[in-house]
């Protein structure tokens, strides 16, 4: 189980934690930006669900309510709204990673070309 992280100060420890969760399929990364934004690049292995549709679309991923979910957008605002929406429907381990560049750095992942 992961607890909310309010300040990302120790990037190497956080990156190690995220990498461990992602490699063991205990976590998922979701890009909540618009499709137009995602076409400019997406973090490798992330899935795309626009923040306005997250409450409805999250069900197609068949996630457990306690599974770790890492969200990002352009600046952290929309991923913050998506975080609240997911918590309101019962997800307990949701983390807003902020903007795409910070999220990629924190996760130690590349930004790659989006393919549908």
Residues covered by each model-derived region:
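Short linear Ser/Thr-Pro motifs
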Residues: 19-20, 75, 79
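Hydrophobic h-region of N-terminal signal peptides that target proteins for export
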Residues: 15-23
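Sec-dependent signal peptide hydrophobic core
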Residues: 6-16
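Rhodanese-like catalytic fold shared by cysteine-dependent sulfurtransferases
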Residues: 2-7, 27-28, 35-67, 77-116
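Short, surface-exposed ligand- or partner-binding patches at beta-edge/loop junctions that are enriched
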Residues: 72
């Amino acid at each position: 189980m992961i607890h909310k992280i309010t300040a990302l100060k120790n990037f190497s420890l956080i990156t190690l934690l995220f990498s461990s969760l992602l490699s063991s399929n205990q976590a998922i990364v979701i890009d909540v930006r618009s499709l137009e934004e995602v076409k400019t690049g997406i973090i490798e292995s992330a899935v795309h669900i626009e923040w306005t549709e997250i409450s409805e679309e999250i069900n197609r991923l068949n996630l457990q309510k306690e599974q770790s979910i890492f969200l990002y957008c352009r600046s952290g605002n929309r991923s913050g709204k998506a975080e609240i929406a997911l918590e309101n429907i019962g997800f307990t381990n949701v983390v807003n990673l902020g903007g795409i560049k910070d999220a990629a750095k924190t996760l130690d992942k590349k930004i790659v070309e989006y393919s549908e």
